[in-house]
């Protein structure tokens, strides 16, 4: 059975995405997003979707509304 499913990235891809989310930028610009997508072997759309969902998860864990952009909003 393959590690990759139709519904999401592989473990290796998630590791790359998580590293960039935690160490590089939670709000990557389009150029950075393109570079992360290339590094992970995903499309820009898949990468953008992953970051959007991961950011909402992070906000919830921090007790913030999932739609706000920062602590000051």
UniProtKB/Swiss-Prot annotation:
Quaternary state and interactors: Interacts with serum response factor (SRF). Component of a large complex containing histone deacetylases such as HDAC2. Interacts with the acetylated forms of HSPA1A and HSPA1B. Interacts with HSPA8.
Listed SUPFAM superfamilies: Homeodomain-like
Pfam families on file: Homeodomain (PF00046)
Any GO BP annotation: negative regulation of cell differentiation
Gene Ontology CC, one term: chromatin
Subcellular localization, as worded in the UniProt entry: Nucleus; Cytoplasm
Residues in the DNA-binding region annotation: 3-62
UniProt-listed InterPro entries: HD, Homeodomain-like_sf, HOPX
Lineage: Eukaryota, Metazoa, Chordata, Craniata, Vertebrata
Protein name, as recorded: Homeodomain-only protein
Gene behind this protein: HOPX
GO molecular function: DNA binding; histone deacetylase regulator activity
UniProt keyword list: Cytoplasm, Developmental protein, Homeobox, Nucleus, Proto-oncogene, Repressor, Transcription, Transcription regulation
Residue pairs linked by disulfide bridges in the UniProt entry: none
Gene3D superfamilies registered for this protein in UniProt: Homeodomain-like (1.10.10.60)
Function: Atypical homeodomain protein which does not bind DNA and is required to modulate cardiac growth and development. Acts via its interaction with SRF, thereby modulating the expression of SRF-dependent cardiac-specific genes and cardiac development. Prevents SRF-dependent transcription either by inhibiting SRF binding to DNA or by recruiting histone deacetylase (HDAC) proteins that prevent transcription by SRF. Overexpression causes cardiac hypertrophy. May act as a tumor suppressor.
Source species: Homo sapiens (Human)
Tissue: Widely expressed. Expressed in the heart, brain, placenta, lung, skeletal and smooth muscles, uterus, urinary bladder, kidney and spleen. Down-regulated in some types of cancer such as lung cancer, choriocarcinoma, head and neck squamous cell carcinoma and oral squamous cell carcinoma.
PANTHER family: HOMEODOMAIN-ONLY PROTEIN
Keyword Signal: no
